[in-house]
């Protein structure tokens, strides 16, 4: 699953300083179907950073609420959400090509016209391609928890990332995060409690029930049978 690159700005120049990469790019083997999808379907459903700032009406042929998911893995849940909510347009960002190929296959098999994907670094896409105040929802589901304390700095959910997401959400837009690591859930809540411009939809420092739009994964169901928890956080951008 794609994670973010935590970054800060140089206080003197204001330029972004890329510091700690929070994903490891391990290119898995492509299946024949995934390779064919990348070759034949990417021109129709793929988005490129070189295209510059996204023009949603040009891409989707309409102006509808837009949902962005960072790190969609193999794409089944994202495709399921797009199929279940045809009145919204969905954009995924994933750096691993097998996952992108798998999503493209889902798009074709399900005949989805409201789903597109980047295969790129999320921070650069957010900065260069996603207009400010343009997203109805940003989704981050089960990011790498980097459970060792010495690696916590690699976690995607950091103040700089939250501030960037806040810029991209429209007023009233939702940041939805989910994790199955309790320590990471606590870290997420700590960062969000300190973030400016957000309101916790469940109340101060409270976790939310899983909303209807987030599909329950097989992995999640197995974990629940073993007594493992899942924590959802829903925060709304204040106007």
UniProtKB/Swiss-Prot annotation:
Q: Where is the active site?
A: 144
Give, as in the UniProt entry, the pathway in which the protein acts. Answer: tRNA modification; N(7)-methylguanine-tRNA biosynthesis
> In which residues is S-adenosyl-L-methionine bound?
69, 94, 121, 144
User: Listed GO cellular component terms?
Assistant: tRNA methyltransferase complex
Keyword Transferase applies: yes
**Which sites bind substrate?**
148, 180, 217-220
- UniProt-listed Pfam families: Methyltransf_4
- GO MF term list: tRNA (guanine(46)-N7)-methyltransferase activity
Asked whether the UniProt record includes Metal-binding among its keywords, one would answer no
EC number(s): the record gives 2.1.1.33
Instruction: State the reactions this protein catalyses.
Output: guanosine(46) in tRNA + S-adenosyl-L-methionine = N(7)-methylguanosine(46) in tRNA + S-adenosyl-L-homocysteine
User: Kind of enzyme, top EC level?
Assistant: transferase
- Write out the entry's keywords from A to Z: Methyltransferase, S-adenosyl-L-methionine, Transferase, tRNA processing
Q: Which InterPro entries match?
A: SAM-dependent_MTases_sf, tRNA_(Gua-N-7)_MeTrfase_Trmb, tRNA_methyltr_TrmB_bact
Q: What does this protein do?
A: Catalyzes the formation of N(7)-methylguanine at position 46 (m7G46) in tRNA.
- Family membership noted in the UniProt record: Belongs to the class I-like SAM-binding methyltransferase superfamily. TrmB family.
The protein's name in its UniProt record: tRNA (guanine-N(7)-)-methyltransferase
């Amino acid at each position: 699953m794609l994670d973010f690159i935590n970054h800060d700005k140089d206080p003197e120049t204001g330029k972004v300083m890329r510091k700690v990469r929070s994903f490891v790019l391990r290119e898995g083997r492509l299946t024949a179907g995934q390779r064919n999808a990348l070759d034949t379907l990417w021109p129709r459903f793929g988005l490129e950073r070189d295209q510059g700032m996204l023009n949603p009406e040009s891409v989707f042929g309409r102006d509808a609420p837009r949902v962005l998911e960072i790190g969609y893995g193999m794409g089944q849940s994202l495709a399921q959400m797009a199929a279940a909510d045809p009145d919204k347009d969905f954009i995924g960002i994933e750096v691993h090509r097998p996952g992108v190929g798998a999503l493209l296959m889902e798009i074709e098999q399900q005949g989805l016209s409201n789903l597109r994907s980047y295969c790129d670094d999320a921070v650069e896409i957010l900065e260069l391609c996603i207009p400010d105040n343009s997203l109805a929802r940003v989704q981050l589901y089960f990011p790498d928890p980097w459970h060792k304390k010495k690696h916590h700095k690699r976690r995607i959910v950091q103040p700089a990332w939250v501030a960037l997401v806040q810029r991209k959400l429209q007023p009233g837009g939702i940041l939805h995060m989910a994790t199955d690591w309790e320590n990471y859930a606590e870290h997420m809540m700590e960062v969000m409690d300190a973030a400016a411009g957000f309101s916790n939809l469940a109340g101060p420092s409270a976790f939310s029930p899983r909303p209807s739009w987030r599909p329950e994964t097989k992995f999640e169901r197995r974990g629940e049978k073993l007594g493992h928890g899942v924590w959802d956080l829903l925060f709304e951008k204040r106007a």
